[in-house]
Amino acid sequence: YKRQKYIIPTLIENALKESNFIEQVMVIGENQKMPAALIQLNFEFVAEWISRKGFNIDKTNHSMIASREVQERIQQEVDNCNLRFGKWEQIKKFELTPDPWSIDGGHLTPTMKMKRSVILKIYSPLVENIYN
């Protein structure tokens, strides 16, 4: 991370994962101007939330991540989490990933640890959206 101040991605990731809306998150931004995050929603929870709220949103992963209501709700979760961190550690932008991260999908190791390089590769278009 460019500035002298170093950030510890796992601290921010764990804080974000306290949200019921967020299943997985990977903080990115090494050698970039700001920290950002790739977020995999808790799709089941989000679908229930959509029903509770009566939003007219298809319960497909793609429709959920594309919806303004879901994007805004996740922004609130990120904003709340950011309050716990210094300015330089705060997540400035995020992208929602369309599929659950899994061992089979190559996102996770058999012990459920994130394969950061694989996730970066899979979602490189999303990373480009963030930093361009």
Range-by-range predicted roles:
Residues 2-87, 100, 105:
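AMP-binding/adenylate-forming catalytic core of the ANL superfamily
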Residues 89, 123-132:
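A short N-terminal helical cap/helix-turn-helix that marks the beginning
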Residues 27, 93-96:
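Hydrophobic/anchoring residues in structured secondary elements
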